[in-house]
UniProtKB/Swiss-Prot annotation:
Pfam families: UPF0147
Cleaved signal peptide residues: none
Protein's UniProt name: UPF0147 protein PH1921.2
InterPro entries in alphabetical order: Ta0600-like_sf, UPF0147
Lineage of origin: Archaea, Methanobacteriati, Methanobacteriota, Thermococci, Thermococcales
Family: Belongs to the UPF0147 family.
């Protein structure tokens, strides 16, 4: 029982870290096109939806971010961040 609570905390902490990265390095970066920032905001909203299980929230965010990950207008540094976030989200079960 305690182990499950610790695991949930770790998952929630990871989700919070991912949200922070998306906010600070994508949403607030004015060099990133608006449509990409908007998609990052949608992914953040999906991750913050506490009504769903963490794995479902992660899957929702993955779907949103994968859709924009190949956008030709995305700056290279942003693409790298998105790929790192996708890798972190894929580890959430």
């Amino acid at each position: 029982m305690i182990k499950e609570v610790i695991l949930m905390t770790n998952v929630e902490e990871r989700i919070e870290q991912i949200i922070q990265v998306l906010r600070e390095q994508v949403v607030q970066d004015t060099a990133v096109p608006r449509n990409i920032r908007r998609a990052a905001e949608q992914a953040i909203e999906a991750l913050m939806n506490k009504e769903k299980e963490p794995a479902v929230r992660a899957a929702d965010a993955i779907a949103i971010l994968e859709e924009i990950s190949e956008d030709p207008n995305m700056p290279l540094h942003t693409r790298t961040i998105i790929w790192e976030v996708l890798g972190a989200l894929e580890q959430i079960k």
